[in-house]
Amino acid sequence: MVRMNVLADALRSICNAEKRCKRQVLIRPCSKVTVKFLMVMMKHGYIGEFEIVDDHRGGKIIVNLNGRLNKCGVISPRFDVPINEMEKWTSNLLPSRQFGYVVLTTSGGIMDHEEARRKHVGGKILGFFF
């Protein structure tokens, strides 16, 4: 079966496993965007550590869950978000100002909206988690 959106499938698997109170989830196939998105989630403590397994096919990622994640999702299509419109997107997607993160892909790499605001860069919106 052909996967249309690898990141969306990965985040849906994580969200479903979190709802079922699982401790680990297996994500396949592996992609660079998925790994960077998981790095942002791990940096903020929403997931535990993850391990990338190279099986010479598509690769696998084993993610340890810690029960802190409420919801995560992908925004499709990937809208352009200039710096001055970042507040509009965060207020639409997140439940409150101090809670959750919007993930962007920028010229400086994949980062959350707070880091993008500090670095004063805009980009395309990938997804969110809280």
Curated annotation (Swiss-Prot):
GO terms for biological process: translation. One of its GO terms (molecular function) is structural constituent of ribosome. GO terms for cellular component: cytosolic small ribosomal subunit. It holds the Pfam family Ribosomal_S8. Keywords: Ribonucleoprotein, Ribosomal protein. Gene3D superfamilies: 3.30.1370.30, 3.30.1490.10. Belongs to the universal ribosomal protein uS8 family. This is Small ribosomal subunit protein uS8. It comes from Strongylocentrotus purpuratus (Purple sea urchin). The gene is RPS15A.
